[in-house]
Curated annotation (Swiss-Prot):
Annotated localization: Cytoplasm
PANTHER family cross-referenced by the UniProt entry: CYTOSOL AMINOPEPTIDASE, LEUCINE AMINOPEPTIDASE-RELATED
Enzyme Commission number, as recorded: 3.4.11.1, 3.4.11.10
Protein name: Probable cytosol aminopeptidase
Organism field: Burkholderia cenocepacia (strain HI2424)
PROSITE patterns membership: CYTOSOL_AP (PS00631)
Broad class of where this protein is predominantly found: cytoplasm
GO BP term, example: proteolysis
Broad enzyme group: hydrolase
NCBIfam families in the record: PRK00913.1-2 (NF002073), PRK00913.1-4 (NF002074), PRK00913.2-4 (NF002077), PRK00913.3-5 (NF002083)
Cofactor(s) it depends on: Mn(2+)
Family of the protein in this entry: Belongs to the peptidase M17 family.
Role description: Presumably involved in the processing and regular turnover of intracellular proteins. Catalyzes the removal of unsubstituted N-terminal amino acids from various peptides.
Amino acid sequence: MDFSIKGCDWSKGEAKGFLTGKSDCIVLGIFEAQTLSGAALDIDTATKGLISRVVKAGDMDGKRGKTLFLHEVSGIGASRVLLVGLGKQDAFNQKAYNDAATTAWRALLATKVVQVTFSLAQLPVDERSSDWGVRAAILALRNETYRFTQMKSKPEPASHTLKRVVFSVDPADEKAAKVAIKQAVALANGMDLTRDLGNLPGNVCTPIYLGNTAKKIAKDWGLKAEVLGLKQIQALKMGSFLSVARASVEPPQFIVLHYQGAAAKAAPVVLVGKGITFDTGGISLKPGEGMDEMKYDMCGAGSVLGTMRAVAEMGLKINVVAIVPTCENMPGGNATKPGDIVTSMKGLTIEVLNTDAEGRLILCDALTYAERFKPAAVIDVATLTGACVIALGGHNSGLFSTNDALAGELLDASREANDPAWRMPLDDEYQDQLKSNFADLANIGGRPAGAVTAACFLSRFTESYPWAHLDIAGTAWKGGAAKGATGRPVPLLAQFLIDRAGQ
């Protein structure tokens, strides 16, 4: 798909090139119960009031989700005009813009258009500039065109014919919009990788597969990859991580991926991703219904690897280290049992009261390992708790942090990236739920505040650096008819790193 930019100030009569240029379709936004403005007004003038007549006749009322194609329109070079309802102008926010862009792409992809002129990026959205609109629109398009067909013997070819999109932007935003295209394509490629890894079955996407994926990213983009095997993990005394991996025939891997975009002495941001490639729950076995979705329990790892690919493609001026502890959580004769006590890399002993609370057991050793990089910040990403799904559903990722400044940066990035997160409490009082009579701490704290106590557990291993935890159990994948990985929170993480890099 080819994307390009053309600056245009509709208010100064600079639209001639758009009006006469050859295109299969021009996309226009129509607000509900508002007079025409911007691109819609200029094209209405060029077509001698056609848009106004269509609106007046009630064929396009501007309500959100409405679309109308106009064919063989005289006065312009495009063979079609697509009108997209935007809803009420005073309620037109980032979500409404994304909905409008998605609606437009769905309508266009169902036709045989090849080249499209897209004017929606210039709409007023929460004081965002049109370069923001370009990036959001490209991500919406790539989301609509994503298909996972790797495991089908005869995959159906793409049904759409769209190949080129020209975005009209405010002239002052033209340079930034070109950067936005590069960022959006890199983000989409990273999200596609994350989704592919999540959607692959557990018998394909094994710990070794994730390790090989990291090596491929390193080879393709000039990164440095280290993949530690069982003996090396044992030498590091990662007893907590190994307690989860011990019953699986798939050997555990500990992946470390280095991206250097800044001076070698600059402290890196460390991303840690939970990589349970299949989670049965272990001896604390999960119910059979829906267990197939536990292939998605490595989406934290997938999102970290996808983010690293995106960062490398964007060429961000920042140092980033990705750490992925990865294994399966299986039952077996040598599996960890409820009540067993294991020793973490940090030296803390952990009473494993529930083997299905395994994500925190592999993450805690990775968080300890992260200390050696003297990081500027550490962010772990995990499909950690069903309790977070109960609390926040599938819209917001749960954000926990012991550092207010870091939490603020991540929340700002989530809003900019349209990848919502909600900060959750992490009060010291919750730590009491992790007390054990027999070890330094237990791996669960009971049913109350389950997402919070899971984060509290992780916080015990993060005292030496600014730390945040993203619980993506509700946002990493969707179930039902639309089952599949979402690619989140790659946009949030990438935006955070873009902001940190000052780009």
